[in-house]
């Protein structure tokens, strides 16, 4: 099988290389693509060195079976036809196609079969916060339909890319050395020792684009009429996002029912013993594949409310891993050219 990675030099592109190696993904030939800035860089995969090729409108994708793309929405839109015209499956990590009616938006633990119908040859990978939330919501949805959701996210610097992680580290360094932050470019304000209650631009709904992604994508992935109200916040940790999630179900559920469902759910690890200080934390979920969930409890304000806390590595399950799992599913059911 011939596999391509578009955006190989970025944080998600590098994670693709690690995950494909870790999971022994069936690759006969690998090709890396990037911009003019990253073309020529060399990376090692399974002991062999690969050079990043310049992404161009040519026939480089003629024999590619699966293309993982993570180079931004503009690049995805510009090159989608070039990537897919010979039959390659394009699994795209950008927001470019997520809400297009003819592009499936897939989280394998929730709606893997949607990936089988892709008129344009494109499968969209959802937003990182949405992925982690729906993996946890799905086993609860099977118990009783979820009517509405309130979520606050606590998103690490890595959600804005490798350069944002470097900026946060630089800010801490500047504070130690001079007591003043001088480097502010990837975030609208200083992030070190701070939280910023805005991720992405504002919309005319008074919600940010990031928050509206959680509303719209959750409904599409889960085939649900659930309404989601989100507040997305940047926090000064390096890696792994966290979310405080409240939901209202049609039928009352006990905490024990919810815990039992989560304990056996695919892609979920239950850590829920707060009396002994056991609960998920981003420091521990970094580099892990599962979404970790805990602090499961009945909501005190509504009869059918459940509240919980989750955390997960948004570069892995929130991006690269989810895309690789989609590809693994397609291979398993024989749905790749």
What does each of the following model-derived ranges do?
Residues 67, 157-337:
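Charged docking surfaces used in two-component/phosphorelay signaling
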């Amino acid at each position: 099988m011939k596999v391509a990675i578009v955006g190989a030099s970025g944080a998600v592109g590098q994670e693709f290389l690690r995950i494909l190696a870790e999971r022994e993904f069936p690759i006969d030939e690998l090709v890396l693509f990037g911009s003019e800035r990253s073309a020529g860089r060399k990376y090692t995969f399974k002991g062999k060195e690969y050079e990043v090729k310049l992404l161009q409108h040519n026939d480089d994708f003629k024999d590619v079976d699966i293309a993982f793309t993570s180079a931004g929405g503009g690049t995805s839109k510009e090159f989608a036809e070039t990537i897919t015209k010979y039959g390659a499956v394009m699994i795209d990590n950008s927001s470019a196609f997520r809400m297009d009616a003819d592009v499936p938006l897939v989280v394998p633990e929730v709606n893997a079969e949607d990936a089988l119908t892709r008129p344009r040859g494109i499968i969209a990978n959802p937003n990182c916060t949405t992925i982690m939330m729906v993996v946890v919501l799905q086993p609860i949805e099977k118990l009783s339909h979820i009517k509405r959701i309130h979520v606050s996210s606590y998103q690490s610097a890595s959600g804005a890319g490798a350069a944002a992680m470097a900026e946060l580290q630089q800010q801490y360094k500047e504070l130690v050395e001079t007591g003043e932050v001088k480097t502010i470019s990837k975030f609208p304000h200083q992030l070190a020792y701070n939280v910023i209650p805005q991720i992405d631009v504002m919309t005319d709904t008074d919600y940010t684009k990031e928050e509206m992604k959680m509303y719209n994508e959750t409904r599409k992935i889960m085939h649900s009429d659930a309404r989601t109200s989100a507040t997305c916040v940047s926090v000064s940790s390096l890696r792994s996002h966290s979310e405080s999630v409240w939901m209202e179900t049609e039928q009352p559920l006990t905490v024990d029912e919810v815990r039992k469902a989560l304990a056996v759910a695919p892609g979920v690890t239950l850590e829920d013993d707060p009396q002994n200080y056991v609960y998920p934390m981003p420091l521990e979920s970094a580099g892990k594949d599962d979404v970790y969930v805990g602090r499961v409890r009945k909501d005190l304000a509504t009869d059918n409310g459940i509240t919980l806390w989750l955390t997960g590595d948004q570069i892995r399950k929130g991006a690269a891993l989810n895309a690789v799992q989609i590809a693994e599913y397609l291979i398993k059911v024989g749905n790749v050219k």
